[in-house]
Swiss-Prot record:
Family designation: Belongs to the XFP family.
A GO molecular function held by the record: aldehyde-lyase activity
Pfam families per record: XFP (PF03894), XFP_C (PF09363), XFP_N (PF09364)
Entry's EC annotation: 4.1.2.-
NCBIfam families linked: PRK05261.1-3
EC top class named in words: lyase
GO biological process: carbohydrate metabolic process
Keyword flag Repeat: no
SUPFAM superfamilies: Thiamin diphosphate-binding fold (THDP-binding) (SSF52518)
Lineage: superkingdom: Bacteria
Cofactor(s) it depends on: thiamine diphosphate
Keywords on record: Lyase, Thiamine pyrophosphate
Protein name: Probable phosphoketolase
Organism: Lactococcus lactis subsp. lactis (strain IL1403) (Streptococcus lactis)
Length: 822
């Protein structure tokens, strides 16, 4: 039986750590000749990279932690995966996966011999190779850690509903200063040890950032303990006065990590066997504070140049100077080669590797085997079970729209709220997928009309519940929205999605912008993952923009920002789907599609306020499938017939106003031939240069079928910023666009006045339509002038009523559709 705490075993662990750290340091500088001292081959200029790139400072600390995580897996037969918050030390995951064989399984050309090791060294941070972070190219990684702050949020999402898994989550002490990371310490208030896995957070307290000390590093152990105990954790420390007494570190780390794992197991046992922690008691989850110096074991001082301090060069080890490349060594500058050789040989590589590049026999069995290897844990590659959700038939939840009631408000007000219509569908999904679907949000689920979900589930919340002051809160539930943090909600969803489950994150449209950058990072991950043949795909990430810009008359200007549409439109279109359904049926049909799509970001803009319902189930299905459709009942031109102008819209309020505008024109000039186009999927309109943009793009012929040849007037009511549609039509080479979107004007005002602020309203759209008809000699001057004057007088009346009485003119807000004159 293996004695995992014996000196012999810890010495083997130390050797494995040295092997990993040797490789992690060497690949920054060398592109070949990786075992120069073992093979007796002196380093030449051609062996070195011309421009070494990488981060050394965090590597040795993280390989130390990775080695001890392997020990825990072996000792406790524990399923575990590694998450590196300070992900710029990418070698800390690349190298362990190479040593345990996972890397070679993913990349067969990177063999576990001298030739394969040389290839690995060359490709690291090298053109055409791999990045310096824990990218999607790295086996075992599901968190790149390039943009700091999300490791605990991702870890939480990853272990929800996975009771057998532990996330070994390393938090950089610089990362710990970010807002998202600081708020994510609260994640333990939402983890139920009865049904979920666990996180073992390790604060990698190496002391320094790029050029500054870290706040936690200059905080006493006593105060750090108070801080984490106040958050509900049970802190324990790994530190030693002599930073080079590595065996002392190993012995202490083994004791600390053993106690941490045993505490986690006891917490889970108490919850699962005795139903503990289900009444407001939060477990004292362990956290490990590891003071592992930056650049640990690397060059200690700059003895070759620069100023001196106490007779020595400026410190590198345990200093910010170790952050990136600690030596100015390259193929063009070999002045510090002796220091590099001294550094690398300090790991005694001849005791770790054979001359053929293989690992010494005694070290080959140190790493776990098969799927117990952290780099081969299925959780990190699309999940243990990444199948799509079991979906109900969305049409069973649809509104009964027909030609008799389209464009009108339905008798039950709740049926006119698209988000409430969606909530019925989501509630059924919860029942069909009790452990594989979750809804996340920042305290907005009730506000965003997911009312029906609360009939079948609760919010998951582990703190004390105080009824009747609290509502729909329980230790078990499929909704997690009780922390007011968009970062947390998005991070939880990303972790949940990247481990093969499906969820959605709904937020106020303007404040979804808080996680712009997180969505960018997720896009970059799935884009890069798609290039890795060994990687499985993922469920799509579903984000819902609601409480939208034209429905924020009550909260005002700060709550008005539809810019997420523009932000995501800039990304590679093959990975982005942006939907603007105009009613409840189309929203249902869109989600039926979104939940079946893979490795996409689905951004759905949805209305939560009572609005007219427009489309039959068949029309909604076509709109969701095709992303765009000509609506015959709102057009006066027949299919294939030349038109005088095109009306188009995308979004709930734009659709109402554009349809009302064309109705106004039709009432006075029924001879006008126009086509109405409803756009649901924005990406169908785009025509972008470069690869990975064409998956859903309309051909030029298809685009012309909808919008006519260049020069055809197009009145476009749009939910977002106008320049997005303008840029799309510019790329299409289509002149004649007049877009009415959000113009960054708004306030606390009336519902209809919000539309007038940006001239999205029907009257401004109708004025533009009549003007182009007049300019193109489709209508006489007298008729056009009279119509335009009437529209302007109506707008003046609107202004007077809203400013004097604080209400809208009922004719505007209560308008309903009636058949066109044809």
């Amino acid at each position: 039986m293996t004695e995992y705490n014996s000196e012999a075993y810890l010495k083997k662990l130390d050797k494995w750590w040295r092997a990993a750290t040797y490789l992690g340091a060497g690949m920054i500088f060398l592109k070949e000749n990786p075992l120069f001292s073992v093979t007796g081959t002196p380093i030449k200029a051609e062996n070195l990279k011309a421009n070494p790139i990488g981060h050394w400072g965090t590597v040795s600390g993280q390989t130390f932690l990775y080695a001890h995580a392997n020990r825990l897996i072996n000792k406790y037969d524990q399923k575990m995966f590694y998450m590196g918050g300070p992900g710029h030390g990418g070698q800390a995951m690349v190298v362990p996966s190479y040593l345990d064989g996972s890397y070679t399984e993913a990349y067969p050309e990177i063999t576990q011999d001298l030739e394969g090791m040389s290839r690995l060294f060359k490709r690291f941070s090298f053109p055409g190779g791999i990045g310096s972070h824990m990218t999607a190219q790295t086996p075992g990684s599901l968190h790149e850690g390039g943009e700091l702050g999300y490791v605990l949020s991702h870890a939480t999402g990853a272990i929800l509903d996975q009771p057998e898994q532990i996330a070994f989550a390393v938090v950089g002490d610089g990362e710990a200063e970010t807002g998202p990371l600081m708020t994510s310490w609260h994640s333990i208030k939402f983890i139920n040890p009865k049904n979920d896995g666990a996180i073992l957070p390790i604060l990698d307290l190496n002391g320094f950032k790029i050029s500054n000390p870290t706040l936690f590093a200059r905080t006493s152990d006593v105060d750090i303990r108070k801080f984490f105990e106040g958050l509900g954790y049970s802190p324990r420390y790994i530190e030693n006065d002599d930073i080079h007494d590595y065996m002392a570190y190993h012995k202490l780390a083994a004791e600390v990590f053993d106690k941490a794992i045993e505490d986690i197991h006891q917490i889970q046992k108490d919850a699962r066997e005795d139903n503990r922690y289900q009444n407001g008691e939060i477990p004292a989850w362990p956290i490990v504070i590891a003071r592992l110096p930056k650049g640990w074991g690397g060059p200690r001082y700059n003895d070759w140049s620069g100023p001196k301090f106490d007779g020595k060069g400026m410190p590198i080890e345990h200093s910010f100077r170790a952050h990136q490349v600690p030596l100015p060594l390259s193929s063009k500058n070999m002045g510090t080669l002796p220091e590099f050789v001294k550094w690398m040989t300090s790991y005694q590589p001849e005791t770790l590797f054979n001359a053929d590049g293989s690992l010494k026999e005694e070290l080959r069995d140190f790493a776990p085997k098969g799927e117990m290897r952290m780099a081969s844990n299925p959780v990190t590659n699309g999940g243990v079970d990444s199948s799509n959700l079991v979906l109900p038939d969305w049409q069973e939840f649809a509104n009964p729209i027909s030609e008799n009631n389209r464009g009108k408000l339905l008798p039950d007000t709740n049926d006119n709220m698209d988000m409430n219509v969606l909530s019925k569908y989501f509630a059924e999904i919860v029942k069909l997928n009790p452990t594989r679907f979750r809804l996340f949000g920042p305290d907005e689920t009730m506000s965003n009309r997911f009312w029906e979900m609360f009939k079948v589930t609760n919010r998951q919340w582990m703190q004390v519940i105080k009824n009747p002051n609290d509502e729909f809160i329980s230790p078990e539930g499929r909704i997690i929205d009780s922390q007011l943090s968009e970062h947390q909600a998005e991070g939880w969803l990303e972790g949940y999605t990247l481990t093969g489950r499906t969820g959605a994150f709904a937020s106020y449209e303007s404040f979804l912008r808080v996680v712009d950058s997180m969505l960018t990072q997720h896009f970059k991950w799935i884009r890069q993952a798609a290039d890795q043949k060994w990687r499985h795909d993922y469920p799509s990430l579903n984000v819902i923009s609601t409480s939208t810009v034209f429905q924020q008359d009550h909260n005002g200007y700060t709550h008005q920002d539809p810019g997420m549409l523009t932000h995501l439109a800039e990304k590679k279109s093959d990975f982005i789907r942006q939907y603007l359904p105009a009613d409840g049926n189309t929203l249902l049909a869109v989600f039926d599609r979104a939940f079946q799509d893979r490795s996409k970001i689905n951004h759905i803009v949805a209305s939560k306020q009572p609005r007219q319902q427009w489309f039959t189930k068949e029309e909604a299905e076509k709109l969701a499938t095709d992303g765009i459709a000509t609506i015959d009942w709102a057009s006066t031109a027949k299919d294939g017939e030349a038109v005088d102008l095109v009306f188009a819209s995308a979004g709930a309020e734009p659709t109402i106003e554009t349809l009302a505008a064309l109705h106004l024109v039709n009432e006075v000039f029924p001879q006008a031939k126009f086509r109405y186009v409803n756009v649901v999927e924005l990406g169908r309109l785009q025509k972008k240069k470069g690869a990975l943009n064409q998956e859903r793009e309309l051909s030029d012929e298809e685009f012309e079928k909808y919008f006519g040849p260049s020069g055809t007037p197009v009145i476009f009511g749009f939910h977002g910023y106008e320049d997005l549609i303008e840029s799309i039509f510019y790329q299409r080479g289509h002149d004649g666009l007049i877009v009415h979107g959000y113009r960054e004007d708004g306030d606390i005002t009336t519902t209809y006045d919000m539309r007038v602020y940006s001239e999205l309203d029907r009257f401004h759209q109708a004025i533009d339509a009549m003007q182009v008809l007049y300019v193109n000699r489709k209508v006489n001057q007298g008729l056009a002038k009279a119509f335009i004057d009437r529209m302007k007088r109506t707008l003046v009346k609107h202004f007077e009523v809203t400013r004097n009485e604080g209400v809208d003119i009922p004719d505007f807000t209560e308008w309903v559709w009636s058949d066109l004159k044809k």
